[in-house]
Amino acid sequence: MRKTFRIKKPEEFQHVFNKHRSVANKYFIVYQMDKPEQKHFRVGLSVSKKVGKAHERVWVKRRIRQSLLELKPELPQELDLLVIARPAAAHRSQKFLKNQMIHVLKLAKILKEENE
C-alpha cells in the first residue's frame, strides 16, 4: 500500500478518533471518518504490545495491509479508516484475518452485503 494511502501523523489519528464512528469484533476495532474532498481512502494501523512481540506485531500489520489492499476496489474512496488490532488477531492466518476484516467492514456498513 502506497504511503499516500496511510495515516501517519498523530494529529490525523486524533482527528479521526475525535470525529469517528466505530465498530468492533473480536479481532479488530475500526474507526471511520468520511472525507468527501479526498480522492482515495487512507488507513492508519495500530497494533499494541498486547498483541505480541515486535515481529508478531509487524506480521499482523502486514496481514491487515494485504487484506485492505485486496479489498481496495470495494472500499469507498472518500474515507479515513483507523484499524486497531486486538490481541486475538495474533497467530491467525491471512485468510482468517481477511474474513474478519470483511466482517467488521460490513458491520461498519463500509462494504455492502452480498444480497443487497
UniProtKB/Swiss-Prot annotation:
Claim: Ion transport is one of the keywords in the record: no
GO terms for biological process, alphabetical: tRNA 5'-leader removal
Protein transport keyword on record: no
Function according to Swiss-Prot or TrEMBL: RNaseP catalyzes the removal of the 5'-leader sequence from pre-tRNA to produce the mature 5'-terminus. It can also cleave other RNA substrates such as 4.5S RNA. The protein component plays an auxiliary but essential role in vivo by binding to the 5'-leader sequence and broadening the substrate specificity of the ribozyme.
Complex formation: Consists of a catalytic RNA component (M1 or rnpB) and a protein subunit.
Family: Belongs to the RnpA family.
Name under which the protein is recorded: Ribonuclease P protein component
